[in-house]
Structures are given as structure tokens and as C-alpha cells.
Amino acid sequence: MSEPRKILVTSALPYANGSIHLGHMLEYIQTDMWVRFQKMRGNQAVYVCADDAHGSAIMLRAEREGITSEQLIDAVRAEHMGDFADFLVDFDNYHSTHSEENRELSSAIYLKLRDAGHIDTRPVTQYFDPEKQMFLADRFIKGTCPKCGTADQYGDNCEACGATYAPTELKDPKSAISGATPVLKESLHYFFKLPDFEAMLKQWTRSGALQESVANKLAEWLDSGLQQWDISRDAPYFGFEIPDAPGKYFYVWLDAPIGYMASFKNLCARRPELDFDAFWGKDSGAELYHFIGKDIVNFHALFWPAMLEGAGYRKPTALNVHGYLTVNGQKMSKSRGTFVKARTYLDHLDPEYLRYYYASKLGRGVEDLDLNLEDFVQKVNSDLVGKVVNIASRCAGFIHKGNAGVLVGADPAPELLAAFREAAPGIAEAYEARDFNRAMREIMALADRANAWIAEQAPWALAKQEGQQDKVQAVCGLGINLFRQLVIFLKPVLPKLAAAAEAFLNVAPLTWADHQTLLANHQLNPFQPLMTRIEPAKVEAMIEASKEDLAAASQPAGNGELVKEPIAAEIDFDAFAAVDLRIALIEKCEFVEGADKLLRLSLDIGDAKRNVFSGIKSAYPDPSALEGRLTLYVANLAPRKMKFGVSEGMVLAAGPGGEEIYLLSPDSGAKPGQRVK
């Protein structure tokens, strides 16, 4: 028997700035199924991951919410871990890139690259926010597209015309953080000399480590010539400071992949049988696989292997690249309710439904996967409930009723049993190759054969015939053994169903090798329902809940003014246009005798005078200070008769009340009576 393989597996690190959604889950479920298969085969497979916890976006969100960056990433990590656990994703370790292991490894790798001559420095001119006192990444700059003239476009590309450009080409640039007009400022940046590794990368990307389509795409980039990679960011920045460079921080994409190593190192400290160098050393005989989406191929297939090579570590055995998730043939949409968070799904549906559906659609390629919700319901109900679970539910009752739950060892259909055993190597080969859809097709073809044979034998009819009880037990006994085989084949995909089946079968946790054996003269436990059908109404409820998630997300987080007083219900333009707002000159302002809160304002609105009572006394203890000021006035508000006289309209002010009331005023140049539009 061959030695167990040593395999280290990672999924891309989710960013610690938001919730996990079903698009993310495609990758983690795919990776988890592959790792579970390897463990069932007896291999030493280790699955590590971590939250990607650095960057300006995290720093700015924490600032908005009035908490520290550390508090934010701790809360998000706890949320992520809960979602993954409930989706049955079984990491050996889930860490954070904001860890001492990652700080030490990132600094050590950088210093090795620097000392080997692979780091360069040069001044870079970029936009700087004078209000926030920080340099702005491309996505934190907005302005008018220099190509098509569309306003409110990001600093690197236009969503209207698709053009790409430098931030300095934007017209009327503004900071997306503060709204200030940015200024150009020079700063010293640190660069990784990626071209030093061009020859190695050309060889490695054609070594079989990548799918062919991915290798072809990388060849285009390699043939066009590699550029140095900017690996530094200026303070303020949430991350690790570069050694010997005060105020300079590693760009998030430098320390993020090193987070794979850091998570494994953290695990090694708790599992003495694991040796860090045995998996990461330059001459390591272990296998290393990264499961990633096609949007981050360049980081993992160019920068990452070059960093590892330059720092004296091994390179990945392979990158397993997948496509995006679409829902009902379209990009996930918040407004349609198809941008579904992991937790929203879990609130409505069994995670194994989605695990199976993804498995039934996932192949080796990088094509996008479509979650068609009608097909999802039909496939799960037909395959899992109607085929697999149906075998056990059909047969268990006869064994308990006719033989006290003892499964006999007869084999009334040797050709059928042989077909199941002969299918095992092909199913294993499909799992190994990540051809999950092929594995599921072959498993369901076996389930169809088992169900057809049981229907042909009709134990429910035999049970009514005298002298046929032994045959009933033989048929149902084989049926349960075939069900057990199917459970073994499906266990990497459906671990919860497998655990429930193991309890019913009264067996220890099943391994892949168990498909070679049969249960005989074996006591079963009472049968309990193993899986229920998906109710379409629950899918609809999930979609509606996702729309509610969008509505909740549109409300700002933290303690800002919109949280204290949310935006009112939407109105159409005609309703707004019906309000006649005018510029008014406050000619006279005085106390109102007997009123605790009111001031009387005498207004000039051009060709007319108006008398207004306003509850702003607490903020303006000296009414005469308002005389001569211009303000905004609602001119067509119906007059209101009050104890102290008639109020003819309303002046506009902001603030929560008390001393915090701020009368609104127009810019200089406005004239009494002018309409506000």
C-alpha cells in the first residue's frame, strides 16, 4: 500500500470588510469537498484559511463605525467562521492575516527579497486628500471620465464606457472619502522587481500547475513584459510597517498570500505532528494547492510564486481556478434578491442542498457556474430525496418489521453489486480531478440502477406473499448495502447526511475503502428521515429576505445622523416640485411673550412681507443677531393660526433641537423672493 500523501490546501482569504455570500461559498464548498475526499482516502490533508484583514477600506470602515480596526476585523472574523461552520466547511485552521505569525513571515520574506536585490525604491506622484491627510488609492478617487464625460466614475476605470485610465486623467477629481479636491503629492514607494523572475514564471506557468486556459492568459501578460510591483502604502494604513521604513506599510496583497503560511504555522504550534518546513521548504515533497477565483489569478500565478522563489520557499503544486457564480443566468443582483448572503441562505435552507447543487455543476474548468433556482429545487428533490434517501426509506421498514432490524448478508443481485464496486475508481478519479459534476452523474446513475432493481423486485408486494419473507430480507438487505455505498461516495459532499446515515446504519464513520465491504447479519438502528424536500416557498422567502438585507444595508452603520434620523419615504419629483422654497430676508426677529420656544420673524420675500413663528429660541438667545440674514422659507405652506397670531409659512433649519439648531442660509448674492430650485 502506498504512503499517504501530504497535502496542504487553501482557499482564497475572504476580506474582513463584509459578509460571506453564495458566490464566496462556491469556492469554500468546492475546496472542502476535495479535502474531505482526500481525508476519506487516508491522506494527510490539511485545510487552512484566514481572514484578509488589512487595507485602507477596513481602516476607513472602522473609523466610520467609531471602533478600532482590530475590533472590526475580530467581529467580521467571528461572523465568517460562523457562516463557514454552518455550511459544514471544515477548516483545520482559520486564522487572520493580522497576526504575529504573518507579521514575522511577511517581514522575513521582504528582507530576504531585499537582501537578494529584488526590491527597488523610487518616488511616485499620486493624489493626496488634504482633509484626511492620506494618499488615495484609485478606488477612493471619483470624477468625470476623460473619455465619455460620465460623472462620478472611479479613478481607474469608467463603468459607463469601460475605458481605463490613470487617476490623474480624471476631470474634476474628488476624494471619495471626504469630498475634498485632491492634490498631487510625491512619496517614496517600494517595488518588488517581478521582471527578475520572468524566465522562472514562463516555465512554471507551463509546468502543469495551471489549467490550460489560465496558462494561456498568463502567457499574454508574460509576453507583453512584466512590470515592477508596487508593494508599499503610506500611513495612515492598517497593516504591517515595512522594516527599516517608518511610515511605510506593506500593500495588502503582499501579506495576504503569506497569510496561508501564517495560518499553517499557527496550526503547527498546536499540532506537533505537522512540520512547517516539511510543507513550505524549498525541497518539500508535500503537495500545495490553492483554490482561487479567476479574478485573482495574477496575484497567485505571478507575484506569489516569484515571492516564494526569491525568498527560498517552494512553489504551489497547482492553482485550482474557478469561475464566478451567476443566479438564474444573470449576475447576482441585490435588487432582484439574488445577491444572497450565506447567513440569509442558512436562515431558510439546508446547507447540504447547496453543497450538492454546486457539486453537480462544478467541473475542472474556469467557466462560470449558474445557480438556477428552479433547477436547484428540482435537482435536490429528485436526486437526493427521490433517489438516494428513497432507497433507505423503502427498505428499512421491512428489515425492522420482518427481521427485528437485522440486515442479512444475502446478495441476490451480484451483477448490480459488482457495478457499484467497479464504479468506485472512476468516481474517485473524478473527485481527484475536481470533476465533481462527473462524480455526481456517476453516483446518481448508480442510484437509478438501485431504485430500478428494487422497484422490479417490489418487496412491498413480496411481503404480502406467503413464503417470500427471506427474499424480502435479501432484497432490502442489498438495498441498504447499496445505499451505504452511495453514502460513502457522497460523503465528501454531504457530511451531515452521511453522519445521519452512519447513525442509522450503526457503523463507525465511513472511509472510502469501506465501499469494498458489505454489512452482513448487522443490527440497524431505527430509521429516521434523512432529508426533506425543498419547498419552493422557502426559496422565495430567501429571495425576499435578501431584498430586505439590501434595504437594511442601505442604512448607514455606526452613530451618524442618518442612523439617528433615517431618510424618509421616497417621493416623486412632482411632490417635491409642489413645495415653493424662497429666499427670505429677516427684517426683524423678537421674543414672543408667553412662549418658551418661539421667536417671531418678520420676513421680506421680495414683493411681499410675511410673519412666521419658529421654534428656534433655544439656539438664538439674542434674536436681534438674526436680523439682516437671508434664510430659506417655505412660501406655500398653509397659514397656521396660533395662540400668538398667524404663522405664514416656515423657515428651514437643521439639527436635533435645543441649542443645536442651525438656521439655513444661501450663499451670498441670493436675493429675497428668489425661488430655490
Swiss-Prot record:
It is found in: Cytoplasm. Zn(2+) binds at C145, C148, C158, C161. It holds the Pfam family Anticodon_3. A motif ('HIGH' region) lies at residues 14-24. PROSITE patterns: AA_TRNA_LIGASE_I, TRBD. It catalyses: tRNA(Met) + L-methionine + ATP = L-methionyl-tRNA(Met) + AMP + diphosphate. A motif ('KMSKS' region) lies at residues 331-335. GO terms for molecular function: ATP binding; metal ion binding; methionine-tRNA ligase activity; tRNA binding. CDD domains: Anticodon_Ia_Met, MetRS_core, tRNA_bind_EcMetRS_like. Residues 575-677 form the tRNA-binding domain. One of its GO terms (biological process) is methionyl-tRNA aminoacylation. It comes from the Bacteria. One of its GO terms (cellular component) is cytosol. HAMAP family: Met_tRNA_synth_type1. Is required not only for elongation of protein synthesis but also for the initiation of all mRNA translation through initiator tRNA(fMet) aminoacylation. This is Methionine--tRNA ligase.
